[in-house]
Regions:
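C-terminal catalytic domain of Rieske-type non-heme iron oxygenases
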Residues: 1-164
Length: 164
């Protein structure tokens, strides 16, 4: 599951995203951080989404990982959501993956609907990823291309968590 955040191309080919998200990745000790920016149609104070294609709002996604077991994703912009994910090994071939979502109470009703849709979309995408994870085979020297993102750098960082 760890490579999903750096495998940007899979968002198009597995999850049918409209574009590949581009982000900045930073690794320091046990921490991995990433920052993404995007644009979305703006919303007025009544919760109406602009459909003219002329008004846009900046959105940000900040992610942090503490080792392989804890992640935080903070979605900011059109609506705000904080998602915490935990990955707990169950045995050699299985993990428990859990998410908790937190949203401000004072969001407009439309923002609440969009935040709920985000939770449902993340659940849908995880379900799409599961068959890939179940059939993934570790390759020590995988063939990677430019569009694969910083997978090699991520694997090097992640290797510190493997037992010798």
């Amino acid at each position: 599951t760890s490579e999903n955040g750096v495998d940007a191309a899979h968002f198009i080919y597995v999850h049918t995203a409209q574009s590949i998200p581009e982000g900045e990745f930073h690794y320091e000790g046990a921490m991995r951080r990433a920052y993404y920016e995007s644009k979305a149609p703006d919303m007025d104070e009544h919760g109406n989404i602009d459909t003219t294609g002329t008004k846009w709002r900046d959105n940000q996604l900040e992610t942090s990982s503490c080792g392989p077991g804890q992640t935080w994703q903070k979605f900011m912009g059109l609506f705000d959501t904080l998602m915490q994910g935990t990955v707990t090994p169950i045995d050699a071939n299985r993990v428990h993956l859990r998410f908790a979502f937190i949203q401000p109470k004072d969001q407009h009703e439309t923002q609440q609907v969009m935040a709920t849709a985000l939770m449902e979309e993340i659940t849908r995408q995880v379900q799409q990823d599961i068959p890939i994870w179940e059939n993934k085979i570790y390759q020590p020297d995988p063939v990677l291309c430019d569009g694969d993102g910083p997978i090699a750098k991520h694997r090097k960082w992640f290797s510190q968590f493997y037992a010798e």
